From Swiss-Prot:
It comes from the Eukaryota. It is found in: Plastid, Chloroplast thylakoid membrane. It comes from Manihot esculenta. It catalyses: a plastoquinone + NADH + (n+1) H(+)(in) = a plastoquinol + NAD(+) + n H(+)(out); a plastoquinone + NADPH + (n+1) H(+)(in) = a plastoquinol + NADP(+) + n H(+)(out). This is NAD(P)H-quinone oxidoreductase subunit J, chloroplastic.
Amino acid sequence: MQGRLSAWLVKHGLVHRFLGFDYQGIETLQIKPEDWHSIAVILYVYGYNYLRSQCAYDVAPGGLLASVYHLTRIEYGIDQPEEVCIKVFAPRKNPRIPSVFWVWKSADFQERESYDMLGIFYDNHPRLKRILMPESWIGWPLRKDYIAPNFYEIQDAH
């Protein structure tokens, strides 16, 4: 069984993998990092004009890192907007995914948080730098193989 968007992508020859539906019936797709930017632009043109959220997670210690995008198709007069969940997996050794900041501006802080916590580099992001941790912090705190430092000194501002 395929979802509506997956069938549309297949019809237009766009490479993806259908992962199923979540508990709310939202279609979930996997897109390769090298295809993500062009498919993101196509999804925006198709009507997915709102990035509801972006998050990231560590799939397994030593394994892949995932960047997850929840997109919504908002139209006037529609009570139940169409939603889709996109997952983009990147290798741990060189986790690079194209930024969608230039497609959905709301990706700005969300991609920065994913970079800060998991070390996923979002190519072509205009301000990719730490947003929660100090600039001097070493490592990526939400990776499953992260070893927390025994001590970290936060210096006073004065």
